[in-house]
Amino acid sequence: MTFEPQIPSWGNEYKNYLERLKSYHDWLCKTGINNGLISEKPLQYVWDEFIVHSLYFGKILQNIKNNDKNIYDLGTGGGIPGIPVALTNPNKLFTLVDISESRAFELQRLKNILNLENVEVFNESADAVLTDNNTYISRCFISSKDVLKNIKQLKNVTYIVSSNGENLNENKEKFHVKQEKFTINSTNIRHIDVINVK
């Protein structure tokens, strides 16, 4: 399989960041795999599922008011989706949160390699940073249904999370959920839920 680092038409504004995104991709495919941050995958899979998928989080963040504060990537693992979103949104602050000390160590090294001044790495459980008035993102860490359970006591929170597109049957008095559908390449569609606590 050949590797083509494409960006779908919905992400044309991200093409200026292609070289930095490819640097992160290279890091994931070497250091990320060698140190257990991600499992071994084909190069194209890593690009489509980890880089392009993450970029759609950034597209959603551009349209959310009150996201000028720090954005938390909970259960970030190898920096997914936080690193691609931070690379393409240099004026926003991101905190990558992971409970694994070894992952946090590697992410701190990556932050220095990529010279990411808008990124902090926090070695802690996700529960430790869930508070009112914040924006959170997660790709594989948690399901949308579990997000609804975990943030129901909070106020003024936005949580953007990968999903399978299922109906959440959320409490409409407490939550507003917008389900986004997008392509990561010419054929594959993915879903992200934007969950707001009222």
Predicted regions mapped to residue ranges:
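Glycine-rich phosphate-binding loop signature in dinucleotide/nucleotide-binding domains
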Residues: 64-67, 129-131
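S-adenosylmethionine
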Residues: 91-95, 99-198
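N-terminal cationic-hydrophobic initiation segments that often serve targeting/anchoring roles
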Residues: 62, 86, 151-152
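Conserved S-adenosyl-L-methionine
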Residues: 73-77
